[in-house]
């Protein structure tokens, strides 16, 4: 996307549209002031229309670094204010200088942050916007710089200078929102990796990033391929990924990731994580309509109004559905009223917690819970912190077919979705609790890994009930033996795998291959055993039939319903 000025070794290559003027001369002396405004083109994303270049607006570049250069050396540096203005005082008079804007937001002290936009196909070079050299003369000077979109009317015909600053503008809004809840926040450094060469292709070649995404070890990757998929003006997409960054930096996510669609019945960890990103995007942008543009000329778009009650169009509302959860999260935050069609009961959202309580729950209970991250510990934290709001919170959860949340484990839930394979009655015999409970020294029978919630769009691997959760409490610390053994009948040789979760401590994984003796006729030989050292407290065991977490087109696709007996013993 932006082939604007990538800064390598402090050399700026991106030229900006600049304007200059001189004011009345200062009192006799040897210095003048240089000031101005930094702006960029923002192309609006419109639901149903994509990017509408005819409605491009000029926006101030807020909080970005501005440098004053003399002979390519930086002689002064400052930051633009909330209106994009900057100012340098005591600049040598009658001197040739230039202005350069770095695509970064930096602040030291408390609060602090470091956000940068770099070109991931050009050595991680920082994008910059460079103005022409001018002479300071003997009077105060105004020098404005503008980053243009590069759109030529039917295609991009010039450097896409505005893109990095449009990206940073979303980060600015996100930071300001967080600061309303936690004014002294220290944000970990983050890089946005954007390039016109970033294509929506999964591969190993430069720019083949697949899709816009947050990766903890890298930062945020954003597509920029014109006529395919560009995200620099998709404010919700950028803010969604910032939501994942905040989740990683200040909260916790146990999400297993993978493909997902709004109507899918997902693993609850994935459902909450994606819902959080989308709801945060609506909060940070102040726009409840999430928009993602793509296609030839960027004229196509996907959009969803997170303010609406999803059960109007969503066939699968519940604690496992990202559309339900994104609406719930936004309704907890906002002051809007959801008005379904006249054929549906009126749901009035009279709760407006604002961002402070949302952030508090997100960064405390959601981070430290011994349960897995999902809607349950989040809502439980809100209910505990705000007992007077419990009835209104419960109204919102029940409107999404989520029973009143009474703990972090989803105790008392009655909605287990709509299976896509077997009947609901059949599935309910195997799956009727969010977590199963067991005692150390006992055997929990018939914990079933299912593929009954497979999606026609996104497959089976991360869907509801493919992975099952068992909670148990350790009172005598030390080495324990965990055994998961298949039981008849099985459709194929089973391969149970186990993940042990200990809150925000590192998880333990046991994924041994099935023994040669494991067969349909000998299911008890299909076993996974490991012996971790456990501390006192609550633990969660995640278990699954390995193939039920594979894609439908995998060489070893899901074998479907596979049940296990589970034991945890202390020698």
Model-derived features with residue positions:
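Active-site scaffold of zinc-dependent metalloenzymes
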Residues: 203-232, 242-249
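Glycine-centered loop-to-beta-strand initiation motif
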Residues: 36, 66, 76-101, 468, ...
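Short, acidic Ser/Thr/Gly-rich low-complexity loop/linker segments typical of extracellular
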Residues: 70-85, 511-512, 518-519
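Short, ordered, surface-exposed loop/turn motifs in non-cytosolic proteins
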Residues: 42-71, 94, 493-496
């Amino acid at each position: 996307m932006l082939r604007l000025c990538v800064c390598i070794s402090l050399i700026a290559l991106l030229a900006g549209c600049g304007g200059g003027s001189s004011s009345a001369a200062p009192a006799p002396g040897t210095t003048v002031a240089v000031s101005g405004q930094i702006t960029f083109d923002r192309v609006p994303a419109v639901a149903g229309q994509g990017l509408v270049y005819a409605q491009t607006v000029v926006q101030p570049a807020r909080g970005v670094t501005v440098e004053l250069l003399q002979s390519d050396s930086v002689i002064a540096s400052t930051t633009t204010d909330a209106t994009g203005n900057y100012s340098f005082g005591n600049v040598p008079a009658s001197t040739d200088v230039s202005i350069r804007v770095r695509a970064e937001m930096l602040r030291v002290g408390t609060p602090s942050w470091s956000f940068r936009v770099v070109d991931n196909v050009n050595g991680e070079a920082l994008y910059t916007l460079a103005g022409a050299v001018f002479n300071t003369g003997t009077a105060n000077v105004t020098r404005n710089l503008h980053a243009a979109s590069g759109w030529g009317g039917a295609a991009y015909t010039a450097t896409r200078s505005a893109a990095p600053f449009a990206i940073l503008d979303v980060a600015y809004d996100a930071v300001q929102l967080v600061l309303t809840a936690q004014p002294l926040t220290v944000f970990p450094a983050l890089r946005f990796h954007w390039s016109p060469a970033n294509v929506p292709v999964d591969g190993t070649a430069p720019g083949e990033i697949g899709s816009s995404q947050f990766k903890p070890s890298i930062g945020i990757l954003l597509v920029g391929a014109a006529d395919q998929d560009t995200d620099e003006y998709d404010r919700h997409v950028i803010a969604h990924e910032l939501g994942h960054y905040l989740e990683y930096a200040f909260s916790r996510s146990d999400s297993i990731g993978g493909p997902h669609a709004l109507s899918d019945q997902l693993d609850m960890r994935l459902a909450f994580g994606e819902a959080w990103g989308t709801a945060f995007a609506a909060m940070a942008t102040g726009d409840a309509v999430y928009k993602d543009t793509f296609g030839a000329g960027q004229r196509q778009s996907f959009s969803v109004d997170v303010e609406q009650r999803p059960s109007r169009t969503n066939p699968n509302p519940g604690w496992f559905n990202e559309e339900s959860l994104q609406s719930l999260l936004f309704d907890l935050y906002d002051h809007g009223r959801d008005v379904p069609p006249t054929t549906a009961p009126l749901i009035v959202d009279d709760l407006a917690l604002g961002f402070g309580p949302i952030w508090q729950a997100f960064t405390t209970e959601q981070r430290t819970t011994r349960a897995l991250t999902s809607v349950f510990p989040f809502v439980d934290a809100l209910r505990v912190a705000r007992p007077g709001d419990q009835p209104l919170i419960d109204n919102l959860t029940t409107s999404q077919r989520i029973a009143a949340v009474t703990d972090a484990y989803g105790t008392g839930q009655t909605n287990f979705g709509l299976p896509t394979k077997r009947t609901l009655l059949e599935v309910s015999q195997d799956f009727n609790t969010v977590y199963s409970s067991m005692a150390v020294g006992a055997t929990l029978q018939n914990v079933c890994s299912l593929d009954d919630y497979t999606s026609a769009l996104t497959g089976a691997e991360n869907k509801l009930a493919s992975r099952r959760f068992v909670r148990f409490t350790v009172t005598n610390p030390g080495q324990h033996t965990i055994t998961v053994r298949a039981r008849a009948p099985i459709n194929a040789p089973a391969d149970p795998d186990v993940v042990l979760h200990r809150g925000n401590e590192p998880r333990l994984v046991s994924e041994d291959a099935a023994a040669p003796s494991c067969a349909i006729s000998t299911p008890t030989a299909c076993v996974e055993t490991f012996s971790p050292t456990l501390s006192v407290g609550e633990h969660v065991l995640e278990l699954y039939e390995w193939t039920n977490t594979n894609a439908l087109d995998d060489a070893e696709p899901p074998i479907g319903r596979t049940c296990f007996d589970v034991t945890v013993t202390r020698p």
